[in-house]
Amino acid sequence: MLNPTSETWRLFLHVVAASVWVGGQIVLAGIVPVVRTGNRELLSLVARQFARLSWPAFLVATLTGIWSIAEINVGDLSTEYQVVLFVKLFCAGLSATAAVVHSLGNSKVAKGVGGSMTLLFGLAAMFLGELLQTGV
């Protein structure tokens, strides 16, 4: 029988948390147009509830990411790996920054661009994470 290690659990938590962060945005992209045509108050309630789930997930992804980096000696890894890791971290940071712009923005532009960039950079960070895991 295969026995899970702390690395198994760390990676599992990281992927689940990132999936909630990014996957939830994809689901919302499909729901928001329908909700928007009905009760405007409902849209606000859905957004607040999503934030209650997505921000803790982002925190878990961040903490497990830090834990993962602490477990490796980055200096011993190839330059390519280090560059991809840096770009992944940068994309994750941009995703969070765009989410803040989306959340705090009052204009349609801030909401639209912030939401779109949150998803785009989140997807990029997930892809780069998979690239790091499967080999550069």
Spans of features found by a protein language model:
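Polytopic transmembrane helical bundles with strong interfacial aromatic enrichment
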Residues: 1-136
